[in-house]
Amino acid sequence: MILKNLAIVIAWALPQMAGATVYNVTPADNLSATINKLKAGDELYLADGQYDLTTTLKINCSGDADHLITIAAAEGAKPIIDFRGEANGTNGITVGGQYLYIAGLTIRYAGKKGIWLEKAKYCTLERLDVYGCCDSGIQLRSGGHNTVVNCDSHENFDYQNNGGNADGFADKQGDACPGNVYIGCRAWGNSDDGWDSFQRETDGTPTVYINCITYNNGPATFDMSAHPRVLGVDAGLFADKSLSSIENGGNPNGFKLGGKGTVHNTELYRCLAIGHRSKGFDQNNNAGAMKIINCTAYANNINYGFGNDYAYTLDIHNCISLDAVDSDIKTHKSGTIIQSHNTWLSGFSTSDADFESLDIEGLLLAPRNVDGTLAETLLLHLKSGAENLIDKGMVYDKSNFEGDVIAGYVGYKGSAPDLGCYETDGTASAIIGITDDVRLINPNQPCYDLNGRRVDASYRGIVIQNGRKFFAK
């Protein structure tokens, strides 16, 4: 299977429940009141425009396994949920329900977290753009079995706390909660970390990252001279300060995977970490099992940092480390390190000359495609002459991963995988578009629903098999 860009687009294909209602709202309508009416199978679509809110938008309704509740942009619309008038310390959107599909929204300038899933389960967030908030852009705590697809969280800064909390994505599940899945997401320019999975004890279900990107989180300073909250409701916090250079005390890490010596099993596949003043991939005191396959770290201080004194396991293969400031990788003697086919090992090497482009700003943050997938660029793609990296990886299949949801994405082109997060044909990771021809489903291979759970032949709805989506009626 050749790996391509990821897309899970389900709002228009889900079967509507008998008796379900479709709601359409505009910025002039009471969005909160409409959400409070939603029941299993209902659909709510937001028209274009800016929805100005000064209090938390609470989503506590629940669908069920066969009838999601949809809250999404109307087809072709780009609704903006704007919280610039909200008091500092107040969350933007909170989600406490189950079986929700929330898609196509811009969420910005919240007084605390942009969108916070608290005890939410079996929810899907897709094509969200979250920025300018006073804490983490997207946070998940407790609950589990949630999927976050093709979302961006960037330039969030908890200036009221000197920058120590605002991550792009904060996966802080608590004790013994099932893992969540992140696919095709980007985090950049946040005051703390790109992803922070602090203090989660696994129940055996790993947190999974597929084709995700993190860049330049924890910058030393922020230019806040044009931020609407700084010029408005929070102006009093900035008296006599130079708005063009506000110091940041956050942690400049990319993927931060653990916390407080707890066991947090984690799998990363075809992920990319660039330009962090600390670590690109960070153990962060994780005492669990961490698996990193076909990832790339570029221009971080430490590209792969796993030097904490815990009895952890690091399983790392087919990875590229390029232009680390301090070191390619750090590990600790207390850990069990299983590694092969990485550029820092004997017999492997890499240099800038192996890559088509290193134009980070011009390519990494390119606008997404209309369906939310990442634009294909040449950034950190291997040149055809990079024979030291092409087809030189460890051969693997889906059995190498614990997370069921990865099964539909694993693959490579050629006799063996290339090293790094991109195959040489310029592709990255994939679900192919939906087909209604269920005759193509192989009855001898497993199928999964959109939350990564294995389903049998009686299941009705969208199923995934070998990276292809089918609509089983």
Label every PLM stretch briefly.
Residues 20-58, 418, 449-455:
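Acidic Gly/Asp/Thr-rich repetitive segments characteristic of extracellular carbohydrate-active
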Residues 21, 42, 49, 55, ...:
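The right-handed parallel beta-helix/beta-solenoid scaffold, focusing on the short coil/turn
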Residues 24-28, 48-54, 61-112, 157, ...:
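Right-handed parallel beta-helix/beta-spiral solenoid domain characteristic of secreted/periplasmic
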Residues 47, 60, 72-74, 82, ...:
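Feature marks extracellular polysaccharide-active and adherence modules
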Residues 54-60, 83-93, 109-116, 132-141, ...:
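Extracellular beta-strand/beta-solenoid scaffold signature
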Residues 264-381:
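Predominantly extracellular beta-rich ligand-binding scaffolds that present long acidic/polar faces
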Residues 347-428:
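C-terminal accessory segments
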Residues 430-473:
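C-terminal outer-membrane/trafficking sorting elements
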